[in-house]
């Protein structure tokens, strides 16, 4: 397993090399795509990217939790959480170590 992290800059550089846009245009394209995804998720929409996976926003209701150290009950407030479900193709690719 690698400890490398893929960044916006890495994505922009990949678009620059593979698509042929200028570095500035590549960075703008990546920013635009990420902004659209962020906006959709912030408004509660589901984002489905074919052969990659699905991002969804779920509302979790209030509940009573427990402090693991003390055993005291603690109220947990309602919140929205972001979830990602990878596609079957992505699961297979990760399981194969990215060799597909």
From Swiss-Prot:
InterPro entries: Hist_DNA-bd (IPR000119), Histone-like_DNA-bd_CS (IPR020816), IHF-like_DNA-bd_dom_sf (IPR010992), IHF_alpha (IPR005684)
Cellular component, GO, one term: cytosol
Keyword Membrane belongs to the record: no
GO molecular function: DNA binding; structural constituent of chromatin
KW Transmembrane helix (keyword) present: no
Disulfide bridge positions per record: none
Keyword terms: DNA recombination, DNA-binding, Transcription, Transcription regulation, Translation regulation
CDD domains, per the entry: IHF_A (cd13835)
PROSITE patterns: HISTONE_LIKE
Gene Ontology terms describing biological process: DNA recombination; positive regulation of metabolic process; regulation of DNA-templated transcription; regulation of translation
Family designation: Belongs to the bacterial histone-like protein family.
Quaternary structure (record): Heterodimer of an alpha and a beta chain.
Function noted in UniProt: This protein is one of the two subunits of integration host factor, a specific DNA-binding protein that functions in genetic recombination as well as in transcriptional and translational control.
Protein name: Integration host factor subunit alpha
Organism: Cereibacter sphaeroides (strain ATCC 17023 / DSM 158 / JCM 6121 / CCUG 31486 / LMG 2827 / NBRC 12203 / NCIMB 8253 / ATH 2.4.1.)
The encoding gene: ihfA
């Amino acid at each position: 397993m690698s400890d490398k992290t893929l960044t916006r800059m890495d994505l922009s550089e990949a678009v620059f090399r593979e698509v042929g846009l200028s570095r500035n245009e590549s960075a703008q394209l990546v920013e635009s795509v990420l902004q659209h995804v962020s906006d959709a998720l912030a408004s509660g929409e589901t984002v489905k990217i074919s052969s990659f996976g699905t991002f969804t926003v779920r509302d979790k209701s209030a509940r009573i939790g427990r402090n693991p150290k003390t055993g005291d009950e603690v109220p947990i407030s309602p919140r929205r959480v972001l979830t990602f479900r990878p596609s079957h193709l992505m699961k297979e690719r990760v399981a194969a170590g990215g060799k597909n």
